[in-house]
Amino acid sequence: MDLGSREAFDRTGTLGIEEEFFVVDEYGRPTAGTDELVYENEPPEPLKDRLDHELFKCVIETQTPTIGSLSAADDALAEVRKALVSHAETHGFGIAAAGLHPAAKWRELDHAEKPRYRAQLDRIQYPQHRNTTAGLHIHVGVDDADKAVWVANELRWYMPVMLALSANSPYWNGFDTGLQSARAKIFEALPNTGMPTAFEDFESFQSFERTMVETGSINDRGELWYDVRPHSEHGTVEVRTPDGQADPDHVLAFVEYTQALVEDLSARYEDGESGANHRRELLDENKWRALRHGHDAELLDRSLEESVPLGELVESECQRLGVSGIRDVYEAESGAEKQRRLLESEGMDALCGSLSVEWDSS
């Protein structure tokens, strides 16, 4: 039983970006393609050992190599995306990104045959059978295991901010859910998801991992799918909240924000600051507001006593941390509203086309 280790947390500030995409046909609709792209054909060099399928054969995941600094993230992300788009096009597929694909109907799509996913389908049943979600996961290296747990605890309040900004999944199984991120609700139906409780230290977190595996609740620690978690194999804190994004600039904005948060919180930990100890129920309320209202959300502030418009929180965070990307994301049309506008004004073909991940060689 591999539970990772305290020793894995041995570096600070490194980055890793994992993206889940939809494999689509010539009309931009999800189609089974991961067998061809992952198993049957050798991927380009940048994707070797960094390409995998997900639960459905229409969902594929990429991972960047470990990135040494934020300044190198742009090139690393571009290299992986370029390779994926080229690989897909070579074999007659396209690539699209969103939290949920508006044309995906889960009953009409094929599940992967990988034993791990088949075991999940058997154990979890309906919630996993319909899980056509795609997200963005960001890893930031932390050089101490107890620090990583403390940072993950504190990051919980910031997760609804990221979710509200990233929300671009209003449609699920062929209808408008009325939500901005239906992905968040679909995924939250699985066990071991959503907003985690706080852990006292790494020992308590690892004890929890061990209990979940040894009692058969999960097959491996990777099935703890919380919105944020210490990753005891990679030695990182992993943020798993954002919807998948077609625009690489939006991805980089969330990477910039996540790294800045981890650096800020790490410094606070080293200064001996006490944790906020937020109630999970109130953090869940913020998450609900984020997935329901997106850019129009009003979230409970850090004191959990007052509602503040998302725009004010974003501006405050940009000034506090010296970041700018999330301001650009907020000031742009939200992904969910863009999808609704396109479907109403131009139809499903235009909407599907807008989710295409493309590569401009210039």
Swiss-Prot record:
Q: What does this chain do?
A: Catalyzes the synthesis of gamma-glutamylcysteine (gamma-GC), the main low-molecular-weight thiol compound instead of glutathione in halophilic archaea.
Q: Which family does it belong to?
A: Belongs to the glutamate--cysteine ligase type 2 family. YbdK subfamily.
| Segments crossing the lipid bilayer | none
Q: According to the UniProt entry, what is the EC number of this protein? A: 6.3.2.2
Gene for this chain: gshA
Query: What's its top-level EC category?
Result: ligase
Q: Which reaction does this chain catalyze?
A: L-cysteine + L-glutamate + ATP = gamma-L-glutamyl-L-cysteine + ADP + phosphate + H(+)
Specify the species: Natronomonas pharaonis (strain ATCC 35678 / DSM 2160 / CIP 103997 / JCM 8858 / NBRC 14720 / NCIMB 2260 / Gabara)
| Protein name in UniProt | Glutamate--cysteine ligase
One Pfam family hit: GCS2
Task: List the InterPro entries hit by this protein, alphabetically.
Answer: GCL_type2/YbdK_subfam, GCS2, Gln_synth/guanido_kin_cat_dom, YbdK
Domain of life the protein comes from: Archaea
- Report keywords, A-Z: ATP-binding, Ligase, Nucleotide-binding
Q: What GO molecular function annotations does the UniProt record carry, in alphabetical order?
A: ATP binding; glutamate-cysteine ligase activity
Q: Does the keyword rRNA processing apply?
A: no
Q: Name one GO biological process term.
A: modified amino acid biosynthetic process
